[in-house]
Amino acid sequence: MSRKRTSPNRNVQIADQIQRDLSELIMREVKDPRIGIVTIQSVELTPDYAHAKVYFTALTGDPEKTQEALNHASGHLHNLLFKRLHIHTVPTLHFHYDQTIEKAVEMSRLIKEANSTRAKDDDEADTPAKDD
C-alpha cells in the first residue's frame, strides 16, 4: 500500500494561508503592547507541517522585543490557527525578524558609496596635474 504524498504546491498553499491568518490574528487577537504594527512577510513550513518559520517586519517598536512577544504569544496563535485551518497538523510557530529590507538598504548605500568614490577617482585621473 502506497502512502499518499503531499505536493510541494500544497505546502505553499498552506504556508500562504497561515501567513494570511496570522496577519489577521495578530492584528485582532494579540493585545501585547510590545507588538506594534507587524507585517508577516513569509512562512516556511517543514514538509511534515510540524514547524513553521514565520518571518515578520515591524513598522513600529523594537524588533527584538516584538519577536520575543510574538514567540510568547505563539501558543495562543497556534490554538487560534487550529480553529481556522482544516489540516491534521497545525505547525509550531517560530517567529523571526526579517532583515531583508535593512540589508537591501545597506547594500544600496554601499553601492552608491562605491560609485561615488569611483566617479571621484575618475575625475581626479582626468584632471591634469598643475605645474608649480
Curated annotation (Swiss-Prot):
Protein origin, superkingdom: Bacteria
Single GO BP term: maturation of SSU-rRNA
Function statement: One of several proteins that assist in the late maturation steps of the functional core of the 30S ribosomal subunit. Associates with free 30S ribosomal subunits (but not with 30S subunits that are part of 70S ribosomes or polysomes). Required for efficient processing of 16S rRNA. May interact with the 5'-terminal helix region of 16S rRNA.
Keywords: Cytoplasm, Ribosome biogenesis
Protein name stated in the entry: Ribosome-binding factor A
Subunit structure: Monomer. Binds 30S ribosomal subunits, but not 50S ribosomal subunits or 70S ribosomes.
Main location group: cytoplasm
Gene Ontology CC: one annotated term: cytosol
Family per similarity comment: Belongs to the RbfA family.
GO molecular function: ribosomal small subunit binding
Cell location: Cytoplasm
Record Gene3D superfamilies: 3.30.300.20
Positions of region (Disordered): 113-132
Cited InterPro entries: KH_dom-like_a/b, RbfA, RbfA_dom_sf
Organism: Burkholderia cenocepacia (strain HI2424)
Pfam families, sorted: RBFA
Entry annotated with the keyword Cytoplasm: yes
